[in-house]
């Protein structure tokens, strides 16, 4: 293990504990915390959105303007999460909005300008605050311009001469594609010719800029790193990732067990441990409470849970065609999520027809997310693609066996029962077809009906898996120093 103490700036568009829309926020809290626990000095940089409750009471560390953006002042607020200083970049023009990225399913038209400003301000504030990181760790397209600006604008700046950049790719489907004019406030883009970022004569990709310019690139699972080298897996960026293959790493995300452990979970009706008596009793109480909460009959049947964004990426289009056929059997399903209104309407209609077996909650509730993990016997993640995934790891911790499509981090973290009975932690299928999903669902249900003891054994084995962030953090440090 590396002994050198590093100073790290972790830049992300959202951080759990302050504001969250997806899994990136979980990583942006848990990984910095684990890096700090390893003895490294870390700051987090994020936009100080007006929706962050603590923002307006936080200390102002800096009030400044950008040299190339003189009419848009910004402030840096001192926020905190898990004892780590969060440098919140406040700018009313860009971050005082009702939401982070979009309203009414419509992305803000100036998102390119907003996050170009954020990246520029991140670098501008560092010498002014006398923070000199060894590593700047960017995440996804929102901060993809950080490595680019570091390499271009600050190439001859002595303050940044020893700074290395890393870009984590959490989901390459979101490339941050914008017209040159949308980010023309950055002087580097006024020429309308930036080969490192260009995707056409008129548009650039912030993600591509980061991939081209970062010193190291990290995919959030080993399998996803391999998938990024293909046209399908990279969503059209294969040549960019192939050109950087020697600098491309794949590190599986960890689980924040301080939040996702049935032994200490304050959300669930009854806590339980990874032994048979405790698990059976705890999950029984939790299942009954969930059934009452969502209006399902109090029955001891196989419970299937799902918590996700309602998008095709999450495999809803594999589930919908076979859902009613599967509901003919003795079981219950609870799905919680928001997203595509068409998918939500279809789920609502099926739930109305099968109200004794299927409940759909069109909302995101952290409490319900925890309840579903604790109550379910099986957890559905039939994703079309899944760079890492976290819910399958949470599920194992609670003894809810994940049913996954073997892609990305799902392939790296779930051992299929039919492939390895002894070490199994769930069930998986490969072909992206509704019929394939139905087959694996029936495999799980048949095992539940015929050998409940075996299901309990697998659940206990799954609960004993360890996907700690401390292990992942050590791999990140090795990458930083590589």
UniProtKB/Swiss-Prot annotation:
One GO-annotated biological process of the protein: glycogen biosynthetic process
Broadest EC class assigned to this enzyme: transferase
Entry GO terms, CC: cytosol
Similarity section: Belongs to the glycosyltransferase 1 family. Bacterial/plant glycogen synthase subfamily.
Keyword RNA-binding appears in the UniProt entry: no
EC number(s) recorded for this UniProt protein: 2.4.1.21
Gene name in the database record: glgA
Disulfide bonds: none
Organism the protein comes from: Aliivibrio salmonicida (strain LFI1238)
Name of the protein in question: Glycogen synthase
Lineage of origin: Bacteria, Pseudomonadati, Pseudomonadota, Gammaproteobacteria, Vibrionales
Pfam families reported in the protein's UniProt record: Glyco_transf_5, Glycos_transf_1
Function: Synthesizes alpha-1,4-glucan chains using ADP-glucose.
Record field: catalytic activity: [(1->4)-alpha-D-glucosyl](n) + ADP-alpha-D-glucose = [(1->4)-alpha-D-glucosyl](n+1) + ADP + H(+)
Binding sites annotated in the UniProt record for ADP-alpha-D-glucose: 20
One term of GO molecular function: alpha-1,4-glucan glucosyltransferase (UDP-glucose donor) activity
Domain of life assignment: Bacteria
């Amino acid at each position: 293990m590396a002994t050198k103490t590093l100073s790290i700036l972790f830049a992300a568009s959202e951080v759990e504990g302050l504001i969250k829309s997806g899994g990136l926020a979980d990583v942006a809290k848990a990984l910095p915390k684990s890096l700090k626990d390893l003895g490294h000095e870390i700051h987090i940089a994020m936009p100080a959105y007006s929706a962050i409750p603590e923002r307006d009471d936080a200390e102002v560390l800096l009030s400044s303007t950008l040299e190339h953006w003189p009419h848009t002042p910004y402030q840096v607020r001192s926020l905190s999460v898990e004892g780590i200083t969060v440098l919140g970049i406040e700018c009313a023009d860009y971050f005082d909005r009702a939401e982070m990225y979009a309203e009414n399913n419509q992305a803000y038209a100036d998102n390119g300008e907003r996050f170009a400003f954020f990246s520029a301000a991140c670098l501008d504030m560092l010498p002014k605050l006398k923070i000199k990181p060894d590593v700047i760790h960017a995440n996804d397209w929102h901060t993809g311009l950080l490595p680019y600006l570091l390499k271009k604008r600050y190439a001859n700046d002595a303050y940044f001469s020893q700074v290395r950049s890393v870009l984590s790719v959490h989901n390459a489907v979101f490339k941050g594609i914008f017209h040159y004019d949308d980010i023309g406030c950055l002087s580097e883009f006024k020429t309308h010719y930036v080969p490192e970022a260009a995707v056409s004569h008129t548009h650039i990709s912030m993600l591509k800029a980061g991939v081209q310019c970062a010193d190291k690139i990290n995919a959030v699972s080993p399998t996803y790193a391999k998938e990024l080298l293909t046209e399908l897996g990279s969503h059209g960026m294969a040549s960019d990732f192939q050109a950087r293959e020697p600098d491309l790493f794949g590190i599986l995300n960890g689980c924040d067990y301080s939040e996702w452990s049935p032994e200490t979970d304050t959300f669930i009706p009854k806590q339980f441990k990874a032994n048979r008596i405790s698990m059976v009793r705890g999950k029984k109480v939790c299942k009954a409470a969930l059934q009452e909460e969502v209006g399902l009959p109090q029955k001891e049947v196989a419970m299937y849970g799902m918590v996700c964004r309602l998008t095709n990426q999450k495999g809803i289009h594999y589930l919908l065609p076979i859902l009613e056929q599967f509901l003919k059997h003795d079981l219950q399903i609870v799905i919680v999520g928001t997203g595509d209104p068409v998918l939500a309407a279809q789920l609502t209609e099926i739930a109305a027809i099968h109200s004794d077996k299927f409940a759909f909650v069109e909302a995101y509730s952290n409490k319900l997310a925890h309840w579903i993990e604790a109550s379910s016997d099986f957890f559905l993640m039939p994703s079309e693609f899944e760079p890492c995934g976290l819910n399958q790891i949470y599920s194992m911790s609670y003894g809810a066996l994940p049913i996954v499509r073997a892609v990305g981090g799902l392939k790296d973290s779930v051992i299929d029962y039919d492939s390895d009975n002894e070490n199994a932690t769930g069930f998986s299928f490969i072909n992206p077809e509704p019929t394939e999903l139905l087959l694996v669902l029936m495999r799980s249900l048949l095992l539940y009906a015929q050998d409940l003891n075996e299901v309990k054994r697998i659940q206990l084995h799954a609960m004993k898996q360890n996907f700690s962030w401390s292990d992942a953090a050590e791999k990140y440090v090795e990458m930083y120093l590589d």
